[in-house]
């Protein structure tokens, strides 16, 4: 292992005190290439919902750090936004907050015959994510989970 810290982890460490000071929650940091362009995306949230001013303030403050630290040698765009209505669930707090909501769980390999499961979030323990599906509780092993997102189900 090279000991090199991923950009997402470095940016998370810089962003965490900023979002906490503003009474926000850091949901995720992504470093992605789309259509030949690089994007550094920071997703924030709060109980009452994110406002444009929240995104602008986090963007302004993290941009100062990025300019000073200069972690990327090439050009990229910084985006700060809410995680959206299909937000990912990352922390234990997320699993508690969204208990009873419909979620989409994607797995690395088929679990109980499928790589995608929709159901009502029943909880999370040390080994599994629990959902209710067709009046039955299912335990999806954490080692198999690729992502868990809220499912708005229009």
Swiss-Prot record:
It is found in: Cytoplasm. It comes from the Bacteria. Keywords: Cytoplasm, Ribosome biogenesis. GO terms for cellular component: cytosol. Its main location: cytoplasm. GO terms for biological process: ribosomal small subunit assembly; translation. Required for maturation of 30S ribosomal subunits. Belongs to the RimP family. This is Ribosome maturation factor RimP. It comes from Heliobacterium modesticaldum (strain ATCC 51547 / Ice1).
